[in-house]
Amino acid sequence: MTKYLFSDFDNTLRNSKVKNSLRIDQKDLDFIKEFQKNNKLIVSTGRPYKQLKEHLLNEYNLMPDYFIVNTGAMICDNKGRILYKKTIDNKIKIQLLNFLKTIVNQIDVIVFATSENESFLFHKNWSKDVEKFFFGLEKLNKTLDYLYDKDLLCLKIECSQETWNKIEDFINKNNLEVNITFNSINNRLFNEIHAFKVSKGQAIKGLQEKLDISSDDIIVAGDDYNDISMFEMFYKNSYMCKHKHNENIRNKARYLIDNIWEIKY
């Protein structure tokens, strides 16, 4: 039977043990390409479709069969056809943007994603390293007004914990039905706001129904908090790549590994 591997990208598929390397380990790459000969690879990531697809093709001649992007807000095939998407409710979006405008001077970075693209709305600490890490994501230098007519898959916000607490308090006090994904990049808080009930696990469920895949044929691999929904819904064949940052959640996956080439199928 065909197996379907749903793998996170950062620190899972791209998980070099060479310090400061941003390359996929060759042994992992060989494993994936061998796996794809008779099975299906789905990259399940917080990153956007367009930039990740180009990166994998240009750097590794690797083409996943499907992409779950923006932490489960959208599913595409490798031709760019959208199979599923869930955008933030328009009324909720307007309430959020109105509030963010009142504290925008406390926010360092805002990234927004639509089904067409993902861009930095603004970035107050721009550098070539930032551009490289985000695969050349465009910086628009726009205000929040730019987003009012956009159908948003998600907002990603870099700010202090104090500022984030204000955002979360606003969401809770106004009973805004959204999903929050907690992240950090280079020890800076970088959280995501998605539509209600968006997660990688829910997206896998959606693709499973569309393609009529047995749960026995689904393998999930990840390393971080935004992968927990995958582990919970598909625990039987769940793998976690060990890192310092996931010591507190290692019980969420059935198997612990150092690299994805260790996955059994």
UniProtKB/Swiss-Prot annotation:
SUPFAM superfamilies according to UniProt: HAD-like (SSF56784)
Pfam families in the record: Hydrolase_3
InterPro entries (alphabetical): Cof, HAD-like_sf, HAD-SF_hydro_IIB, HAD_sf
TM annotation in the entry: none
Name assigned to this protein: Uncharacterized protein MCAP_0867
GO cellular component: cytosol
Lineage: Bacteria, Bacillati, Mycoplasmatota, Mollicutes, Mycoplasmataceae
GO MF terms, alphabetically ordered: magnesium ion binding; phosphatase activity
Organism: Mycoplasma capricolum subsp. capricolum (strain California kid / ATCC 27343 / NCTC 10154)
